[in-house]
């Protein structure tokens, strides 16, 4: 069992199709925490400031996993994190993976929500 804390403002609004992406990314990131981190806690922080959407997911698990274990290496059958990174980069965003002091991992994603541009082809 993993205890999950979720933090966002009461009036948070995420436009389509970004809401679907965020849902899928959170689902994949929490699945990774459950399967690979050996942690007992996960924290999700979601915010939007002037069209900049920020998603942070961290855990208190094992901080010394390799990139292959994390699904970021080339020689791995696990593609979850590398898939998220690719999607974020296609949207012109940033994806950062780091240690979560004192233990665990932290993933930070930032993307700009463009109201006029449609990325629906990207979600399908």
What is each PLM-predicted segment?
Residues 2-9, 45, 95-98:
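Conserved transmitter core of two-component histidine kinases
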Residues 33-37:
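Short helix-loop "hinge" at the ATP-lid/N-box region of the Bergerat-fold HATPase_c
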Residues 41-51, 58:
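Short beta-strand/loop element within the Bergerat-fold HATPase_c
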Residues 103-107:
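Glycine-rich GHKL/ HATPase_c ATP-binding element in histidine kinases
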């Amino acid at each position: 069992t993993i205890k999950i804390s979720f933090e966002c403002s009461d009036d948070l609004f995420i436009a389509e199709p970004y809401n679907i992406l965020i849902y899928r990314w959170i689902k994949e990131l929490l699945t990774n925490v459950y399967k690979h981190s050996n942690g007992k806690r996960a924290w999700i922080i979601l915010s939007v400031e002037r069209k900049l959407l920020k998603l942070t997911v961290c855990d208190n698990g094992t901080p010394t996993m390799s990139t292959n274990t994390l699904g970021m290496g080339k020689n791995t059958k696990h593609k979850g994190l590398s898939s998220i990174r690719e999607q974020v980069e296609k949207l012109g965003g940033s994806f950062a993976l780091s240690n979560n002091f004192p233990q665990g991992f932290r993933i930070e994603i930032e993307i700009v929500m463009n109201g006029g541009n449609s990325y629906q082809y990207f979600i399908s």
